[in-house]
């Protein structure tokens, strides 16, 4: 069932009665344009350029992360109110987490809010997904590309693990690009298997 709604200048359609037993569920991909247009804006992809991290310090970066995660909670609540049961999370939740050029930081400061996201995912039966970028190429013949891919996929998996600790495990999934075949399909498949 489709419902037409208007919020301010925005007109949107809600698909109602989403549930586990439906083969296809539509959802939001990283950004809610209605919430983003609010003042202050609600969005979960705040970033910092490396120079800003160096100048302002890792604590400024962590504050961006916490605001991203607080806004994920807000978006999940909005999704629940509007019958949306699938929500793709932005890969930018933790800027530079897998970037070797930026000082390492851990997830400890964000553990509680990640658990809260997991609890909401479970309570709302809201599927949370990550879809790491196309530059993640598990089958690449280049060692450096493969290592960076592993680092980035580990980042995404770690975030989903923390969400799962909060109860969202059955609803937390990662979708990975298969990538190219690099001129030798069998060798690429073997690299994937390794």
Label the predicted regions.
Residues 7-127, 136-139, 144-147, 158-165:
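Alpha/beta catalytic barrel-like cores
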Residues 131:
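Conserved, mostly hydrophobic/aromatic
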